[in-house]
């Protein structure tokens, strides 16, 4: 039996507000900013983004988040690297993905 939290292991498949969960990727030179949602996701003790991950052609980077923090992460890219996708994990609604 899956717990609600585990139901979101396939990205973007949980019935929840996409505008608050799908990562938004912004690339400026070698810095990548990933914001969770086009509408800011709540960061409450009972409902928050646990982590944000950036997948690149050369690997992955991840930032752990806590309740009360901004649901944003900034990652640095090597000159030869490119963004593939960003992921965010909501403690209630599971895994969300955006491709670049």
Give residue ranges: language-model regions.
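Short acidic/polar inter-strand loop motif in beta-rich domains
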Residues: 91-99
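Short amphipathic, basic-aromatic surface patches that mediate peripheral association
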Residues: 36-44
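Short strand-edge motifs at loop-to-beta-strand transitions and within beta-strands
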Residues: 71-75
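Exposed beta-strand and adjacent loop surfaces of beta-rich binding modules
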Residues: 31, 49-51, 83
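Short, aromatic- and glycine-rich surface loops/edge beta-strands on solvent-exposed regions
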Residues: 82-92
């Amino acid at each position: 039996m899956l717990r609600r939290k585990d139901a979101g292991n396939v990205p973007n498949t949980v019935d929840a507000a996409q505008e608050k969960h799908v990562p938004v990727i912004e690339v400026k030179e070698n810095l990548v900013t990933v914001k969770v949602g086009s509408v800011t996701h709540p960061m409450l003790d009972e409902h928050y983004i646990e982590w944000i991950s950036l997948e690149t052609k050369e690997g992955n980077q991840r930032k752990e988040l806590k309740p009360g923090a901004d649901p944003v992460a900034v990652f640095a890219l090597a000159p030869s690297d490119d963004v593939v996708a960003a992921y965010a994990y909501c403690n209630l609604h599971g895994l969300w993905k955006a491709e670049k």
